[in-house]
């Protein structure tokens, strides 16, 4: 199980490294489709690892992710993921151990917890999605 999770984390990091910002209702990821990254491929994209999508080893909630203003994500270990008006995302997910919510900067925003304390915030300014570099924090 640990090896499988490690492999998924490597895939997620590769995915983040190749993500391309786009405008409007197109992809914000090479592995996502739909408005602001609705997960469709193996739970990766902007769901899967941390919230939404299929999750890791089926721990997420299939069919849910972030499109439009966003939808509730995954429930993991009894911690429920919730979306509030596209601005604040209190949630529980794999690897996100910081504050219980994330404020968007200048519009829509949604963090992606990918395990082991690695957090990759994605911030939307206007209609342009701008993935930021992953931040490795001791949290």
UniProtKB/Swiss-Prot annotation:
GO molecular function: structural molecule activity
Highest rank taxon of the organism: Eukaryota
Repeat in keyword set: yes
UniProt xrefs under InterPro entries: Lamprin (IPR009437)
Sequence repeat spans: 42-46, 47-51, 52-56, 57-61, 62-66, 67-71, 92-96, 106-110
Positions of the UniProt region annotated as 8 X 5 AA approximate repeats: 42-110
Chief place where the protein resides: secreted
Signal peptide stretch: 1-19
Cellular compartment(s): Secreted, Extracellular space, Extracellular matrix
GO CC, one annotated term: extracellular matrix
Keywords: Extracellular matrix, Repeat, Secreted, Signal
Function description: Self-aggregating protein that is part of the soluble form of lamprin.
Subunit comment: The polymeric lamprin chains self-aggregate to form fibers and have secondary structures particularly rich in beta-sheets and in beta-turns.
Protein name in the entry: Lamprin 0.9
């Amino acid at each position: 199980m640990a090896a499988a999770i490690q492999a998924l984390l490597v895939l997620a990091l590769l995915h983040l490294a190749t993500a391309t910002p786009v405008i409007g209702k197109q992809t914000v990821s090479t592995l996502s489709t739909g408005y602001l990254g609705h997960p469709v491929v193996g739970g990766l994209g902007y769901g899967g690892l941390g919230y939404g999508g299929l999750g890791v080893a089926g721990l997420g909630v299939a069919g849910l992710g972030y499109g439009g203003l966003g939808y509730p994500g995954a429930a993991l270990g009894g911690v429920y993921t919730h979306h509030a008006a596209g601005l604040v995302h209190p949630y529980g997910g794999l690897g996100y151990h910081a504050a219980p919510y994330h404020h968007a900067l200048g519009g829509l925003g949604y963090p992606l917890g990918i395990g082991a304390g690695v957090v990759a915030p994605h911030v939307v300014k206007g209609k342009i999605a701008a993935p930021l570099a992953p931040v490795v924090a001791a949290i």
